[in-house]
Structure formats: C-alpha cells, structure tokens
Amino acid sequence: MSTVDFSSSNQTTFLITPLCDNGSNFADYEPKVKVLCGAKGILKFLEGHAQKPKELHVANGVFMKPGTIDKPATEEEIENAETKMDTYEQNEAMCKHILMSSVSPHLCLKIKSLATPNSMWVAICTDVKNKSTLQKMDVR
C-alpha cells in the first residue's frame, strides 16, 4: 500500500500508510496520525479540545472591542481577531485534510460531511472497532 506524504513549511516530510478499509493496520495508523497532528500543532483539533476564537461583536456595521457592546474596536484589534480566526480555520482544515486523505475512499465518503476533525476521528475509530475479527484477519 502506498503512503500519503504530508510536507510542512520547513520541508519536513511525514509519511502515513493510509488506513485499510478493513481497519487491519489501525494499530500502525493511529499513532502516526496523532504524531503528525502533534508535529503540526493541531492535535487539539483531533482530540476535540480546540477552542474557537471569539468573534468581535458587530453593532450598526461597526466591530466592537472584545467584551464590550458600545466601544469600537481599533484596526489592530480587528486584524488580531481576524488573524486568530484565520489560523483556527486553517488548522481545522489541515486536520480534516489529514484524516480525509489518509483513509479509503469508502470511509472518506462517510466522514467528509462531519463538522469537526474530532467527529471525523471518532467516526474513523468507531468504524474500525465495528469491524469483526473475521474481517480483520481475512485480509493478508
């Protein structure tokens, strides 16, 4: 089975053997996905602990300072909030990409519509655990 290549910005390459549709290589796949997510700083998305940044309140089309409803935010505060949200969304998308590109097309169809990387990960783990011993041993 071929491997999936994930390169980082500093040219470090991580290789993961995709999860077999029958889950027979899950013992190898699971720690590699966790290490890859940890190396990319996105393990909290996989585990469901990522906290979405708070959005700035908008009143009459004007962004308000964090924690207020009547004081306009500065340009720096707006940019900071947008940067935090962009980073969060990019990291969430990266985690989803890792999961979707490292499972079989059949399993990808099952998980692609799930909202979070954690819900995808839970679905992958559940799918593997629901495979019978006979199915796992049948593939050699």
Functional labels for PLM-detected ranges:
Residues M1-R140:
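N-terminal Lys/Arg-enriched interaction segments
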